[in-house]
Amino acid sequence: MQWETVIGLEIHAQLSTQSKIFSASATSFGAEPNTQASLIDLGMPGTLPVLNAEAVRMAVKFGLAIDAHIAPQNVFARKNYFYPDLPKGYQTSQMDHPIVGKGHLDITLEDGTVKRIGITRAHLEEDAGKSLHEDFHGMSGIDLNRAGTPLLEIVSEPDIRSAKEAVAYVKAIHALVRYLGICDGNMAEGSLRCDCNVSVRPKGQEAFGTRAEIKNVNSFRFIEKAINHEIQRQIELIEDGGKVIQETRLYDPNKDETRSMRGKEEANDYRYFPCPDLLPVVIEQSFLDEVRSQLPELPTQKRERFQSQYGLSTYDASVLSASREMAEYFEEVAKVCGDAKLAANWVMGELSSLLNKEGLEIEQSPVSAEHLGGMILRIKDNTISGKIAKMVFEAMAAGEGSADAIIESKGLKQVTDSGAIEAMLDEVLAANAEQVEQYRASDEAKRGKMFGFFVGQAMKASKGKANPGQVNELLKKKLEG
C-alpha cells in the first residue's frame, strides 16, 4: 500500500522584546537562574498583568507579513494545566480570539518549485519556566527566568507532505521572523521551537489519520530526522496490524527515535476561559496602517527582486535571500564588482564553504563584502585567473588584506602578454615533442583528451599566472599549425 504523510507544525517564536509580556522583568538569555522572575511572573496574590504593547506590535507585524486577517479585537484566555515550571497553574494564551487569523507563506522546495502553506493562526502567549534535571542529585531544579517571556505561536494548516517540506517551511518562518526583527531565531537557545504533528493515510484517502505530536524540536536537522522516524514508525505499526494512538512524543537525537511522553490533550482538557485580569485588545485601523508602513522588504519579495533584477535562478535567489544578513552581503558584493552572477557564485561557493567549515554566520565572515567584490573585479579585468583567485580568497580569509594588496605582495598578477605566453608555450611543446607528434596523428576524440595535458603543462610552467583563455587559443594554433 502507498502512504501519504500529513504534517502540521506549531512554531513557538520568542519575541525580541526587552521585557516580558505581562511584567517589566528582563528577557535576556543566560542570566543566573531565578534572577529574572518578578512577583507577576510567579503569580503571587495581589499582582496584576500589564500587556506589553511591543509584543502586540510584533504579532501584528508578522500577521501583515503573511497576508493574514488581523482581529480587530482579540482576547487572552487562561490555559489550565499543572506542571512544575508553570508557577501560576495556568498559562495566559489566546484560544477563540487570536490576534492573527488565516494567512499563508510560500516555500521554495529543493527542485525550485514554490508551494503555498496555509497558516491557521498565530497567537500571543507567555512561556513557561524551565525544568533542569542535571546536577541536582536525582532531583529536578526549576528556573523561572523564562516564565512570562512573550511567545508567538504560529500554527500551520496540515498542508505539508514530507519532512523536507517541513524543514523548508520552518526555514521560511525562521527567515521571516528575523527579517521582521521580531525574533532572533536562535534555535540552540530555544528562541524558535517546533512541535510537529504527524499522521499517515492511504494515498488517495481524504480523511486524516491519527496524529502524534513531537514536542519541542529545536534544529532543522532534528526536525527532518524526527518526522522521518515518526512516519516510518506509524507505517510499520499500521502494516503490522496495530493502531496509532493520539499522543505526545519526544525526539531523542542520541538514539534517533521518538518515544511516548503522554496522551495528547484536547482543547477542552485545558478548560480555557477568558482571562479576568486582561481587557480585550482592540486593534485600530490606524495602528495597522502604521505597522504596515514599517514592514521591510520580505524574503519572498527579495527573492523575486533578485530574480528579476539580477537574473538569478529561483534556487540561487532563495539561498541568497534566506537571511537579511546574507542578502545584504550579496548585494554589497554585487555593487562593488558590478556582476551579480559572479557575486552569487562566490558567495554561495567559496564563501559559504568557508563559513560552514568554520561554523560562522555571514555577519562573522572574515572576508568583507567589499574585499570579495574587489577580488571579483580583478577576475573580470583579467588581473588574476579563477584559479589564482582561490589563492587570493584564502589569503583574504587569513586576514592578509585586500585582493589588490595580496596580488601585489605575492606577485600573483596574471600574465596577459601574448609574446611571453607564446615563448612559454614553445618551451612546453619542445619539452613534450613526442606528445605533440601523437596529438597531430590522433583523431578529434583523442585530441580533446590530450589537449588538456598541454594546458596543464602550460599552466604549471607559468605557475598558474598565464591567462587561461589566451593559453587555450595560442596553444590550439601552435598544435594545429
UniProtKB/Swiss-Prot annotation:
Pfam families recorded: GatB_N, GatB_Yqey
Secretion signal span: none
EC number of this enzyme: 6.3.5.-
Keywords for the protein's UniProt record, in alphabetical order: ATP-binding, Ligase, Nucleotide-binding, Protein biosynthesis
Example GO biological process: glutaminyl-tRNAGln biosynthesis via transamidation
InterPro entries in UniProt: Asn/Gln-tRNA_amidoTrfase_suB/E, Asn/Gln-tRNA_Trfase_suB/E_cat, Asn/Gln_amidotransferase, Asn/Gln_tRNA_amidoTrase-B-like, GatB, GatB_C_1, GatB_Yqey_C_2, Gln-tRNA_amidoTrfase_suB_CS
Top EC class of this enzyme: ligase
Keyword hit for Protein biosynthesis: yes
Domain of life the protein comes from: Bacteria
Catalytic activity entry: L-glutamyl-tRNA(Gln) + L-glutamine + ATP + H2O = L-glutaminyl-tRNA(Gln) + L-glutamate + ADP + phosphate + H(+); L-aspartyl-tRNA(Asn) + L-glutamine + ATP + H2O = L-asparaginyl-tRNA(Asn) + L-glutamate + ADP + phosphate + 2 H(+)
MF-aspect GO terms: asparaginyl-tRNA synthase (glutamine-hydrolyzing) activity; ATP binding; glutaminyl-tRNA synthase (glutamine-hydrolyzing) activity
Keyword Protein biosynthesis belongs to the record: yes
Subunit note: Heterotrimer of A, B and C subunits.
Function recorded in the entry: Allows the formation of correctly charged Asn-tRNA(Asn) or Gln-tRNA(Gln) through the transamidation of misacylated Asp-tRNA(Asn) or Glu-tRNA(Gln) in organisms which lack either or both of asparaginyl-tRNA or glutaminyl-tRNA synthetases. The reaction takes place in the presence of glutamine and ATP through an activated phospho-Asp-tRNA(Asn) or phospho-Glu-tRNA(Gln).
Family: Belongs to the GatB/GatE family. GatB subfamily.
Annotated protein name in UniProt: Aspartyl/glutamyl-tRNA(Asn/Gln) amidotransferase subunit B
Species of origin: Ectopseudomonas mendocina (strain ymp)
Upper classification of the organism: Bacteria, Pseudomonadati, Pseudomonadota, Gammaproteobacteria, Pseudomonadales
